[in-house]
Design a protein with these regions (language model features):
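Central hydrophobic cores of alpha-helical transmembrane segments
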Residues: 35-39, 169-181, 325-330, 396-400, ...
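Alpha-helical transmembrane segments and their membrane-interface exit regions
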Residues: 42-45, 63-64, 156-160, 179-182, ...
Length: 459
């Protein structure tokens, strides 16, 4: 039951989350999983109500995904990883002198998609709730008891592996990584999850850190002074989003944001963003017109995939079946001792679906009321301040420190070394073109994958 204090806490957490992720979103090259998952997990382990943490998380998605496109539009530099596909279209617009128009359209698309996809996803999840019990029913396959949702996860990890840059290595990694995880659990003597999850999360960062310890490799790292970044000038941007986009752009946002929010249940948000954007760009003969349409629609898709990829697995399936739910939203599927189970189970058992929907919509509105006006009025000033005063490396140092503390909490000193082992291997695989989503989803399905391998091998 939601009371007045719950609303107050949701307001405070959503506001803080929005302000924090406005800054993180603008920082160049920030990774969504590395910056969102550790904080959500820390809040859950600290005993914060899981529904309030989910409110924090939804507000973070909105603030992060709106702001990570700002440095793209103004400087041609991506904020988060999801903003990377936007760079070519942004550069096309900058060359033609339309950087301010691009920023205006992107902000408007993000606002519309945030509200649309959240309401749409909650409605679809409610309709699919009866399917949840069926998906959690277990069947006997080769003598192994397997929940039906596992096959959704398995299909998702195969699809993700096939869309990775290094397809063959990604496919081979699935059984190998599952065996490593189960082997480490055997050493620990318990079902450790959190430290492994954190290891994958910080993998690319830790790989870079350890690589820099090698004298020969360190010499190959380019050293430069301060980088000069020129921000495009922007004119007035209307607060009314419908004044900033045309009918065709609005139609594509209304069509593709909901569709991709469903597809993100098992598919990669980055892959969907690239695919749909490229198709729309190629549909236009005029290069600038195609870039504008692709950029605007992608801003909507970014929000759609992150919201849908989180809520449908959480509310309906009860398992992380896609890169989003297994990655940034992964903490909601981990066993948390303080609440006696998994956060998503706590949310569904302690609150009605109406209460959950209302608090999430409220948190989204709080985030939009803070983020959208700030970005519309002060995007250039905020970007300049963040670029000058805040170091991305210092934030990554903070997230690594959080990960080390949580790994110790999870499994003591062995948990830290296990996390570092998983981190180095994950980082190396990511460097070779394997999507981290493959590793996150393999982590979830590792017990079943290994059990099936043993059954097939007659062990």
């Amino acid at each position: 039951m939601i009371d007045l204090m719950m609303i107050v806490y949701a307001t405070i957490l959503s506001a803080i989350s929005s302000l924090v992720y406005i800054v993180i979103g603008i920082l160049p090259g920030t990774d969504e999983t590395a910056t969102m998952a550790p904080i959500a997990l820390a809040l859950l382990l600290a005993g914060v109500d899981p529904l309030l943490v989910l409110s924090w998380f939804i507000a973070a998605i909105i603030a992060f995904k709106i702001t990570d496109a700002i440095p793209v539009a103004l400087a041609g530099i991506p904020g988060g990883v999801m903003a990377v596909p936007q760079v070519p279209d942004a550069l096309t617009a900058r060359e033609k002198g339309y950087a301010d128009t691009l920023l205006r359209k992107g902000n408007s698309a993000a606002l519309i998609a945030s509200i649309l996809t959240l309401v749409f996803t909650l409605a679809v999840a409610w309709l699919l709730l009866p399917v949840g019990d069926w998906l959690n029913t277990k069947d006997q396959v080769l003598g192994v008891s397997i929940p039906r949702w596992f096959w959704i996860l398995f299909a998702g990890v195969i699809i993700l592996a096939l869309t990775s840059k290094n397809k063959l290595l990604a496919l081979i990694t699935i059984p190998l990584f599952a065996l490593m995880i189960q082997g480490l659990r055997g050493v620990y003597g318990k079902n450790v999850v959190v430290s492994f999850f954190l290891g994958i999360t910080i993998g690319p960062i830790m790989y870079e850190v350890f690589q820099s310890l090698n004298k020969d490799l360190r010499r190959s790292i380019a050293r430069r002074g301060f980088k000069e970044v020129k921000l495009a000038k922007i004119d007035r941007i209307y607060l009314n989003p419908f004044k900033n986009i045309n009918r065709e752009e609005l139609a594509n946002i209304l069509i593709w944001s909901p569709i991709t929010s469903i597809l993100a249940t098992v598919m990669s948000p980055v892959g969907l963003t690239i695919l749909i954007g490229d198709l729309l760009r190629e549909s236009k003969k005029d290069k600038l017109e195609g870039a504008m349409l692709a950029y605007t629609t992608r801003e909507g898709i970014k929000l759609g995939t992150y919201i849908g990829g989180t809520l449908i697995p959480l509310l309906v399936i009860g398992a992380p079946t896609g890169p989003m739910s297994a990655g940034p939203a992964g903490p909601f599927f981990q066993d948390i001792q303080g609440i006696g189970g998994k956060p998503f189970q706590y949310i569904l058992s302690h609150y009605s679906y109406l209460d959950i929907s209302l608090i999430l919509i409220y948190s989204a509105l709080v985030s939009l009321l803070i983020t959208y006006p700030l970005i519309v009025k002060y995007s250039r000033e905020i970007t300049r301040y963040v670029f000058r005063r805040i170091s991305a490396e210092s934030l990554y140092g903070l997230f690594i420190a959080i990960a080390l503390v949580l790994a110790y909490y999870d499994a003591g000193l062995p948990g830290i070394f296990g996390m570092l082992l998983v981190a180095v291997i994950s980082g190396a695989l990511a460097r070779q073109g394997v999507s981290l989503g493959v590793l996150f989803m393999t982590l979830v399905g590792a017990p079943t994958i290994v059990a099936l391998l043993k059954a097939v091998g007659g062990v």
